[in-house]
């Protein structure tokens, strides 16, 4: 029996929008618990993903991108989620896209904890034309904030993810595991299903449809043999409905089909998925409406 102490703790994955936080979280855990698209603001909730190894349990908190535009209830809510996560965790991984430092990255620096608890992860390094660009880019960031470690990674190529996990593990406190060994997330299947529908919407019509769109699971009936799910897509304007439907309803059919396939894979059983649309004007700019729709 190993005498090595078990370590467990919460790890926040933070950064400005669209730097690859959810892709990195999914790659570290080895399962899709956070939705991914090329659009900013895809992640709106804190999502806990769990990875258990022989001597460690990592509880990852995938946060929304930190917003530098102010004034909207949705942006205020997402920034509260980020700042709360930073206060509640044991280790912070600050994700910065390789070669693309911006004001949004800099705005997070004053919120980061002490250097020994913070790791700089340079994401998407496979997109760099030359690795010679990496050192001056990292030096520029380190001149503005001290980090306990710097790890260049590529989540899509599985590059240096083990090294990042080792750096995180060194900083976790000793303690008993918080979740069963086979747990992947503390989010419900209903929540993950709604997120998967929202992912398909962002991927298919994200360029045309503004961010006033969310998904609520209104029916969930599950047996050992199959599941029947009804998902309501809530939009802010009547003009959003035809964008979602597409010509002859083709967009909605594709969204439902692709989401159903992912949910069936997750549940490991056949799924009947019904997706329909409701208009709720101005919901994304009213904090009461955000709470009603399940936002923190």
UniProtKB/Swiss-Prot annotation:
<dbReference type="InterPro" id="IPR006073">
    <property type="entry name" value="GTP-bd"/>
</dbReference>
<keyword id="KW-0694">RNA-binding</keyword>
<feature type="region of interest" description="G4">
    <location>
        <begin position="123"/>
        <end position="126"/>
    </location>
</feature>
<keyword id="KW-0472">Membrane</keyword>
<dbReference type="GO" id="GO:0043024">
    <property type="term" value="F:ribosomal small subunit binding"/>
</dbReference>
<feature type="domain" description="Era-type G">
    <location>
        <begin position="7"/>
        <end position="174"/>
    </location>
</feature>
<keyword id="KW-0699">rRNA-binding</keyword>
<feature type="binding site">
    <location>
        <begin position="15"/>
        <end position="22"/>
    </location>
    <ligand>
        <name>GTP</name>
    </ligand>
</feature>
<feature type="region of interest" description="G2">
    <location>
        <begin position="41"/>
        <end position="45"/>
    </location>
</feature>
<dbReference type="Pfam" id="PF07650">
    <property type="entry name" value="KH_2"/>
</dbReference>
<keyword id="KW-0997">Cell inner membrane</keyword>
<dbReference type="InterPro" id="IPR030388">
    <property type="entry name" value="G_ERA_dom"/>
</dbReference>
<feature type="region of interest" description="G3">
    <location>
        <begin position="62"/>
        <end position="65"/>
    </location>
</feature>
<feature type="domain" description="KH type-2">
    <location>
        <begin position="197"/>
        <end position="281"/>
    </location>
</feature>
<keyword id="KW-0342">GTP-binding</keyword>
<dbReference type="GO" id="GO:0005525">
    <property type="term" value="F:GTP binding"/>
</dbReference>
<dbReference type="Pfam" id="PF01926">
    <property type="entry name" value="MMR_HSR1"/>
</dbReference>
<feature type="region of interest" description="G5">
    <location>
        <begin position="153"/>
        <end position="155"/>
    </location>
</feature>
<feature type="binding site">
    <location>
        <begin position="123"/>
        <end position="126"/>
    </location>
    <ligand>
        <name>GTP</name>
    </ligand>
</feature>
<dbReference type="InterPro" id="IPR005225">
    <property type="entry name" value="Small_GTP-bd"/>
</dbReference>
<dbReference type="InterPro" id="IPR015946">
    <property type="entry name" value="KH_dom-like_a/b"/>
</dbReference>
<dbReference type="GO" id="GO:0005886">
    <property type="term" value="C:plasma membrane"/>
</dbReference>
<feature type="region of interest" description="G1">
    <location>
        <begin position="15"/>
        <end position="22"/>
    </location>
</feature>
<keyword id="KW-0547">Nucleotide-binding</keyword>
<keyword id="KW-1003">Cell membrane</keyword>
<feature type="binding site">
    <location>
        <begin position="62"/>
        <end position="66"/>
    </location>
    <ligand>
        <name>GTP</name>
    </ligand>
</feature>
<dbReference type="InterPro" id="IPR005662">
    <property type="entry name" value="GTPase_Era-like"/>
</dbReference>
<keyword id="KW-0963">Cytoplasm</keyword>
<comment type="similarity">
    <text>Belongs to the TRAFAC class TrmE-Era-EngA-EngB-Septin-like GTPase superfamily. Era GTPase family.</text>
</comment>
<dbReference type="GO" id="GO:0005829">
    <property type="term" value="C:cytosol"/>
</dbReference>
<dbReference type="InterPro" id="IPR004044">
    <property type="entry name" value="KH_dom_type_2"/>
</dbReference>
<comment type="function">
    <text>An essential GTPase that binds both GDP and GTP, with rapid nucleotide exchange. Plays a role in 16S rRNA processing and 30S ribosomal subunit biogenesis and possibly also in cell cycle regulation and energy metabolism.</text>
</comment>
<dbReference type="GO" id="GO:0003924">
    <property type="term" value="F:GTPase activity"/>
</dbReference>
<dbReference type="GO" id="GO:0000028">
    <property type="term" value="P:ribosomal small subunit assembly"/>
</dbReference>
<keyword id="KW-0690">Ribosome biogenesis</keyword>
<comment type="subunit">
    <text>Monomer.</text>
</comment>
<dbReference type="InterPro" id="IPR027417">
    <property type="entry name" value="P-loop_NTPase"/>
</dbReference>
<dbReference type="GO" id="GO:0070181">
    <property type="term" value="F:small ribosomal subunit rRNA binding"/>
</dbReference>
<protein>
    <recommendedName>
        <fullName>GTPase Era</fullName>
    </recommendedName>
</protein>
<dbReference type="InterPro" id="IPR009019">
    <property type="entry name" value="KH_sf_prok-type"/>
</dbReference>
């Amino acid at each position: 029996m190993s005498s090595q102490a078990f370590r467990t703790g919460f790890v926040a994955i933070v950064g400005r929008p669209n730097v690859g936080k959810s892709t990195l979280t999914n790659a570290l855990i080895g399962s899709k618990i956070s939705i991914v698209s090329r659009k900013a603001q895809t992640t709106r909730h804190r999502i806990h993903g769990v990875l258990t190894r022989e001597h460690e349990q990592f509880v990852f908190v995938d946060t929304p991108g930190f917003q530098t535009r102010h004034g909207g209830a949705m942006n205020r809510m997402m920034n509260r989620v980020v700042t709360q996560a930073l206060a509640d965790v044991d280790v912070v991984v600050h994700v910065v896209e390789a070669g693309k430092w911006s004001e949004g990255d800099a705005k997070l620096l004053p919120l980061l904890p002490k250097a020994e608890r913070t790791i700089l992860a340079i994401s998407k390094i496979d997109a760099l034309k030359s690795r010679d660009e990496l050192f001056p880019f990292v030096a520029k960031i380190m001149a503005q904030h001290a980090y306990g470690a710097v790890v260049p990674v590529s989540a899509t190529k599985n590059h240096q993810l083990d090294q990042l996990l080792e750096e995180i593990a060194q900083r976790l406190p000793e303690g008993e595991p918080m979740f069963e060994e086979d747990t992947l997330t503390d989010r419900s299947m209903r929540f993950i299903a709604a997120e998967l529908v929202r992912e398909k919407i962002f991927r298919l019509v994200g360029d045309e449809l503004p961010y006033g769109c969310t998904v609520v699971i209104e029916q969930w009936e599950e047996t050992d043999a199959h599941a029947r799910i009804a998902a309501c897509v809530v939009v802010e304007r009547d003009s959003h409905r035809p964008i979602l439907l597409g010509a002859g309803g083709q967009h909605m059919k594709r969204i439902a089909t692709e989401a159903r396939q992912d949910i069936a894979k997750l549940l490991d059983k056949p799924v009947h998925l019904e997706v329909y649309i409701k208009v709720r004007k101005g919901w994304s700019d009213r904090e009461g409406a955000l709470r009603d729709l399940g936002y923190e």
